[in-house]
Amino acid sequence: MKVGAEVRRRGNREDGRQVMARLKKTVVMVGMMGAGKTAVGSALARGLNVPFLDSDEEIERAANRTIAEIFARDGEPFFREKESQVLARLLRGSPCVLSTGGGAFMAEGNRRMIREQGVSVWLKADLDVLWHRVRHKATRPLLRTPNPRETLRALLEARDPVYAQADLAVESGEGTVEQMAVRVREALATRPDVLETDE
C-alpha cells in the first residue's frame, strides 16, 4: 500500500502546461466518519472533471428517508443490505469518485466488489481528528450512545485493520480539503490502470 503523502507530486509539465488525466476506474473513498470522504472526494472529482457520488445520499434518495431514520426504523442489518445494493449499482456506472459510509468497507462482499470494479482509497485519521469533526453532529446514528467518544474509539480500533486492506491510503489530518485531494490524486497517479495521464 502506498501512502499518498509519500508519492511524488505530479500536476504540471516543466513547460508549465497542465497534465491532463483520465480516470479509468471508480475511486471509492473509504474510512471512518469524519475522515473527510465527502469533502475530499468532491474536491477530487472536480479536479478530475468526473461525477461525485455519495453512497449514503443515494441510499437516502432510494429510501426517501435519512440514514438515521433507516437505522431507527429498520435497523443496521437492513441498512447494510441496502448499502451493498446501492454500492453494486454505482460501481457498474461510469468512472467517478464515490464516497462511502464508514461501515461500507467492513463487508467482505463490498470489499470484493470495490477491488474488482474500482480502487479503494483510505482516508486515514486519528481519534482526536475524527472526534473534533463529528462531536457536534447529530446525524451519526452509531454515536448515539452514553459515551460517543469511547464508541468512536472502539469503532476506530475495530475498523482500522480492515481499512488497511484498501488499495491506497492517504493521511487525513493537516491541510485543507484541496491539499488532501491533491494527495489522493498523487496516490492515484501511481496506478496507471486507474488514472491515465498524457505525460
Curated annotation (Swiss-Prot):
It is found in: Cytoplasm. It catalyses: shikimate + ATP = 3-phosphoshikimate + ADP + H(+). One of its GO terms (molecular function) is magnesium ion binding. This is Shikimate kinase. It comes from Cereibacter sphaeroides (strain ATCC 17023 / DSM 158 / JCM 6121 / CCUG 31486 / LMG 2827 / NBRC 12203 / NCIMB 8253 / ATH 2.4.1.). Mg(2+) binds at residue 38. Belongs to the shikimate kinase family. Its cofactor is Mg(2+). Substrate binds at residues 56, 80, 102, 159. InterPro entries: P-loop_NTPase, Shikimate/glucono_kinase, Shikimate_kinase/TSH1, Shikimate_kinase_CS. Keywords: Amino-acid biosynthesis, Aromatic amino acid biosynthesis, ATP-binding, Cytoplasm, Kinase, Magnesium, Metal-binding, Nucleotide-binding, Transferase. The gene is aroK. Its main location: cytoplasm. One of its GO terms (biological process) is chorismate biosynthetic process. GO terms for cellular component: cytosol. NCBIfam families: PRK13946.1. ATP binds at residues 34-39, 140. Binds 1 Mg(2+) ion per subunit. Catalyzes the specific phosphorylation of the 3-hydroxyl group of shikimic acid using ATP as a cosubstrate. The keyword Transferase applies.
